[in-house]
């Protein structure tokens, strides 16, 4: 019984870890020549529901275009 509980606990933890970073897809660097409207348009062209510009998670000084998957 304890092994079944441990299995489900590990399964849930692994599922959360694997899916937490899949919501957004990094697409392009945002700069004055590629703004939020361009980001949204390009993401929609590639089949995503939309896109937005935000600071990069690794290098916050760089603004990146992220395409949403939901």
UniProtKB/Swiss-Prot annotation:
- Biological process (GO), any one: defense response to fungus
Cysteine disulfide partners in this protein: 30-53, 39-65, 43-67
Q: Which InterPro entries match?
A: Scorpion_toxin-like_sf
Q: Which segment of the chain is annotated as a signal peptide?
A: 1-23
GO CC annotations?
extracellular region
The record's family statement is:
Belongs to the DEFL family.
Q: What is this protein called?
A: Putative defensin-like protein 280
Q: Which organism is it from?
A: Arabidopsis thaliana (Mouse-ear cress)
